[in-house]
Amino acid sequence: MKLIPDDNWRWYFDADQARLMLDLANGMTFRSRFSATMLTPDAFNPSDFCVEDAALFFTYQEKCLTLNIDAQAKAELVLNALVANRFLKPLMPKSWHFAALGHGEYCPQLGELVWVRLNERLEDACFMVVDTGDKASLCLLAQAELALSGKVMVLGEAIKIMHDRLCPVDEGADHAQSSLHFAHAG
């Protein structure tokens, strides 16, 4: 099933589940992965899915087309990216997990897929940039999981990363191809 935003979509907070929800107006509801403590006060008030949300939805959806994950995982990533961009409290960078890649003045674009190299072992990981800043960007994990310092991040989990740790997937795809698992056009 392909998701297409419409005027009937609604954001609301479900106190029983302690999660922000998106009513997709077709009998389906999306449950975000972010707990109540991670959300801004705006998340607790019902609101319409606005034009800006729809524009971001299509930006994120287009950018994740090359990911080799199933359609349901892509939809989950896109919708969690919307939640993170609009309702997530600011995070402090946790860049010490990743190696500096020496990309100087690189500043990723909204929705861009980027890769990082882990400091603790020779492994690369893929993230989607969901909000950009001057020196660091909010990113969501764009792969099934990632073991990171004794914890396991899962698809759509948020982390803020300094730009000198990020490399655009299109520039590093050959280098990182073995661990990023992208779909190939053919």
UniProtKB/Swiss-Prot annotation:
It is found in: Cytoplasm. Pfam families: ZapC_C, ZapC_N. One of its GO terms (cellular component) is cytoplasm. It comes from the Bacteria. The keyword Transcription does not apply. Keywords: Cell cycle, Cell division, Cytoplasm, Septation. GO terms for biological process: division septum assembly; FtsZ-dependent cytokinesis. Transmembrane segments: none annotated. The keyword Cell division applies. Interacts directly with FtsZ. HAMAP family: ZapC. Belongs to the ZapC family. Contributes to the efficiency of the cell division process by stabilizing the polymeric form of the cell division protein FtsZ. Acts by promoting interactions between FtsZ protofilaments and suppressing the GTPase activity of FtsZ. This is Cell division protein ZapC. It comes from Musicola paradisiaca (strain Ech703). The gene is zapC.
